[in-house]
Amino acid sequence: MGLFDAVRRVFGRGDRAGTGAGDGASASDEDGGDWGLDAEAAAGDPQPGPRRRGGGHGRHWDTAVANDETLREVIATTLDDGQVRSSRVPDVDAVEYGTGALRCRVLRRDGDVVTAYPVAEGVAHESTVTEVTPWATDLEADATVVLGPEEFATYASSAWIAGGVPLGDGTVEIAALAYAPERTEESTYQTEDGGEFSTSGIAGFVPVDGGGVADYAFQSTVREIQRVPLFTANGYRFRVPLTRDGDGGEYETWLYAGAHAIDGRVPEAGDDVSGVFWVQTAVQ
């Protein structure tokens, strides 16, 4: 049994599977299910396909702010005090606000707000973009990338700059934002050949049934922890291996979590951590 198959067995199906995170719900929804997510909202977030799709960031904000009031404050402050960045798309710009590794980005067209989302500092990897699905706004997109042994869909946070994402090889900055991460105790499972598989120290992620395009159930091990400001509150980011290749080489990312989102004690270096995150990429 390979690592990816083993992670699927732990997270992907059956009574251990989580519910998904859609893009339509508000940050204050509390009917979260096993993973702190809203399956009903997820039903409104279609999987990527050949045509342009709708989308939004309602549930994505749950990783960074505790409630709708805080979200409104963050967006208002961004528009009042943020730095304006230009786009190569006519009549489009972005306003960004935030100190440190996590910022709010508000996209505007002709001065009108199109959307707002949290954007996080990630870890840069040499990667390949194999598929791009534009959103209906023409300023956002899902990008499928290859990282080590995995090929997976992400939210392309850089698409607004040029109105799309280039296919092919390049440098891709990857960050993950967790909805409800928690410290994870070791579990063991019987394999098909009669052996045992331990979850201790694994690093992997799988799509969440009913979740958004870039939502994944994950488990990993904390290598480093930093306390970071998350707008008006405190939060954390954890350096973790996102996946490993067959030779044991690790592909790391920064995993972000607001203090309000962490279930139980804050993980420390060396702890295994699990939950559901959404993945964003900036193609450089």
Tell what function each PLM region has.
Residues 2-15, 29-113, 272:
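N-terminal ordered "arm"
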Residues 259-274:
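Short nucleic-acid-contacting surface segments enriched for D/E, G, S/T with interspersed K/R
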Residues 17-26:
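Intrinsically disordered, low-complexity regions enriched in glycine and serine
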Residues 77-215, 235-236:
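Long, hydrophobic alpha/beta structural blocks
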Residues 271-284:
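Short, charged beta-turn/beta-strand-edge "cap" motif at the junction between a beta-strand
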Residues 219-222:
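Conserved beta-strand residues within beta-sheet cores
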Residues 224-253:
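OB-fold (S1/OB) nucleic-acid-binding surfaces
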